[in-house]
Amino acid sequence: MAVHPPNPKYVPKPYEQMSYPGQRIQVDVKFVPSACLKNSKVIGKQFFQYTAIDEYSRWRFVEAFEEHSTYSSAQFVEHLVKAFPCTIECIQTDNGTEFTNRFTSHREKPTLFQKHLEMHGIRHKVIHPYTPRHNGKVERSHRKDNERFYATHLFYSFEDFARQLKVYNRRDYNNFPMRPLGWKTPNEVLREYLRSM
């Protein structure tokens, strides 16, 4: 009987700390839980939360969409570029078809999302397949959204969802002190950086 040596232990690469806002922004899409959709107009429909988090300041931008597509992703980029007060150098996403054609038969053809990134001079970085931990900041924020927002809210229309999501993000997330930021809020970190320029 042959004895096989044990598999080598996986050693993750050290995390690359960002040095300034806009250096890299993580983007992902969250499916809104169907339990939050209680009106006959919205039962059976699907709503989506697009989320972007700046890795340096943890500043977050969210937007509600009725579809999960490369068109919605391109629209989200346009709104993110207008909302973020600094130049965006890189956007990191997973391998979803709303972001890339990497695992489709059109792999060489850029998506509308990628074309919009190119128009703004933004580099697109995709994470390794099946490694959501590489987009950990945005994934963690989605878990917090489940606890703080979706567990306690109902939506009676798409407009109602979009309005409540906007209020929640403005009130709760960007003004919430965070330990990795030295107990400052994302808005405070961004303001301090912009004042130092």
Say what each PLM segment does.
Residues 1-33, 37, 97, 108-114, ...:
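Basic, flexible linker segments flanking DNA-binding modules
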Residues 9-16, 23, 120-122, 143-197:
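C-terminal domain-tail junction helix/linker
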Residues 27-60:
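An active-site-proximal beta-strand-loop segment
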Residues 45-46, 62-90:
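Active-site beta-loop-alpha junctions of metal-dependent nucleic acid enzymes
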Residues 59-63, 125-127, 151:
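Short small-residue beta-strand/loop micro-motif enriched in glycine and branched aliphatics
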Residues 64-65, 101-107:
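Short, solvent-exposed loop/turn segments at secondary-structure boundaries
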Residues 88-98:
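Acidic beta-strand-to-loop metal/phosphate-binding motif
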Residues 93-95, 104-107, 112-117, 122-147, ...:
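RNase H-like two-metal-ion nuclease catalytic core shared by retroviral integrases
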